[in-house]
């Protein structure tokens, strides 16, 4: 995975965007979050995932072990550390260049994979998960521009034994959902999004990827962030899900990420009679 040198990010930015769009499809910021942030986030996720009763995905073939994968949703409502995570300045800089500087937050959730937990089917997140239902998407949809950027923040060691996410380098250049017949090729050719707790692994949501089985003796947890361009509907309803005090203390950036001032959809019958759109 291409590693970003944050001290020279401005000079690297064009290369980073190129790597995400037409290179391997993934980059990493090592040590993006300190040990205290990782510990805070992990404590919340362990507490919130004590029971395996939340919606999960891509586990259709693993019904007997699905209880070993646990999701925690709506993290902005569960601790200030997550407010900080979605506003990491270097991640924001990359995302602004990739999705436009009015991007917003699609989701911030966590995935906890217990020892013995299963992997997922190879899939894409573009802009969500369901492109296997191709008839639900526009004609000639293609990979020429991005509508999703994913960030994985490991809270435990991510390696081959613990089930670090696998991805197929360059697969974002051919926008389609992986077929069952692609799986042997995927597993033979895939690389791993390996990392240490506190890293930020950033990848193009069109890239074929999946969690792998956790064959270690410890949990493998991560915070999962989805960013979207301003015109894509967020996956999670942030404003309905967070307490008012989170909204009240939010920075202008966090307010935008949550959609506090999102103008659409709008009741134009009730809008003030003035010109609001146009260059003049």
Where do the protein language model's features map onto the residues?
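Non-heme Fe(II)-dependent double-stranded beta-helix
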Residues: 1-135
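Catalytic core of non-heme Fe(II) oxygenases with the double-stranded beta-helix
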Residues: 93-94, 118-193, 232-241
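A structural signal for short, well-ordered beta-strand segments
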Residues: 108-110, 151-153, 223-227
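Non-heme Fe(II)/2-oxoglutarate
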Residues: 1-9, 200, 207-208, 212-280
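Residues that flank catalytic or metal-binding motifs in active/ligand-binding sites
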Residues: 78, 106, 147, 161-163, ...
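Active-site rim elements
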Residues: 79-84, 188-191, 210-212
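Short Ser/Thr-interspersed hydrophobic loop/turn segments at strand-loop and sheet-helix junctions
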Residues: 158, 206-207
């Amino acid at each position: 995975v291409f590693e970003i040198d944050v001290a020279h990010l401005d000079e690297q930015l064009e290369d980073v965007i190129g790597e995400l769009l037409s290179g391997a499809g993934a980059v990493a910021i090592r040590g993006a979050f300190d040990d205290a942030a990782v510990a805070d986030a992990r404590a919340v996720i362990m507490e919130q995932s004590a029971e395996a009763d939340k919606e999960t995905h891509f586990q259709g073939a693993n019904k007997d072990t699905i209880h070993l994968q646990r999701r925690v949703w709506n993290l902005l409502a569960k601790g200030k550390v997550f407010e900080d995570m979605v506003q990491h300045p270097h991640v924001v800089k990359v995302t602004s260049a990739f999705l436009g500087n009015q991007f917003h937050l699609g989701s911030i959730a966590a995935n906890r994979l217990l020892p013995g937990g299963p992997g997922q089917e190879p899939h894409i997140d573009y802009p969500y998960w369901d492109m296997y239902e191709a008839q639900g998407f526009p004609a000639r949809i293609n990979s020429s521009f991005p509508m999703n950027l994913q960030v994985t923040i490991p809270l435990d060691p991510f390696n081959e034994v613990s089930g670090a996410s696998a991805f197929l380098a360059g697969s974002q250049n051919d926008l389609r959902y992986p077929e069952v017949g692609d799986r042997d090729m995927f597993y033979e050719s895939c690389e791993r999004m390996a990392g240490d707790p506190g890293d930020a692994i950033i990848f193009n949501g069109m890239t074929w990827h999946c969690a792998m089985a956790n064959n270690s003796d410890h949990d493998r947890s991560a915070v999962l962030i989805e960013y979207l361009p301003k015109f894509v509907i967020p996956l999670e309803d942030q404003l309905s899900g967070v307490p008012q005090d989170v909204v009240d203390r939010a920075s202008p950036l966090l307010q935008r990420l949550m959609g506090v001032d999102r103008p659409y959809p709008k009741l134009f019958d009730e809008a003030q009679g003035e010109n609001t759109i146009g260059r003049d």
